[in-house]
């Protein structure tokens, strides 16, 4: 067994990206051992949320001071302090989970729209989007499926609860949901695109149509306008 990774010395707000980096070293089903911050630094429930976002199941089993983290197939969150906007997909596709970049399948128009809107300046580079532009990325549900219609409504409800805790902890001012299904399933079945009256924790909520190429009713200029509006707050 390799030596555990000691995550106690990093700042609490840097923990999501540290866990994401650790996640990228493991294949699904593999385990990693980490020495995690004490409960008075990061609450256990929040720590479980952050582990889930990074693609780890947080196990109770400990080896000395280390906790075993088991990797599952998903796309790790790209989140951290100072975000101005959190972009939230429905859930990862197998391609996104395996390639490590969301919205990157051929025909998906998220990145072309994000570039055209001035939201990001590098194509398919979520790390740069976070560090250079304050744009984070996550998903409502972290379970990977081939189609979003394979998800259950309860998964959206549980996923939004995780997001509430995260956006309040990181003080995210606004969240943009790419795809309407998650918000409709968990909060407002009649919700349309645009800014919502209801917030997600303390964050304002913007809904926009799916950027998938299967969504023929939304053109690239329309998607660009939605992202520009979400970024403008």
Kindly give the residue locations of the regions a language model identified.
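Short N-terminal binding/cap micro-motifs at the start of the first secondary-structure element
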Residues: 94-98
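Short, conserved loop/helix-junction motifs that constitute active-site signature segments
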Residues: 25, 167-170, 198-201
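Short, surface-exposed acidic-centric catalytic microdomains
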Residues: 4, 99-154
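Short, well-ordered beta-to-alpha junction loops that form the rim of enzyme active sites
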Residues: 37-39, 90, 177-182
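An N-terminal amphipathic alpha-helical segment
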Residues: 1-33
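C-terminal capping/extension of enzyme domains
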Residues: 43-45, 50-81, 106, 113, ...
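Internal catalytic-core helix/loop-beta-alpha segment
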Residues: 134-189
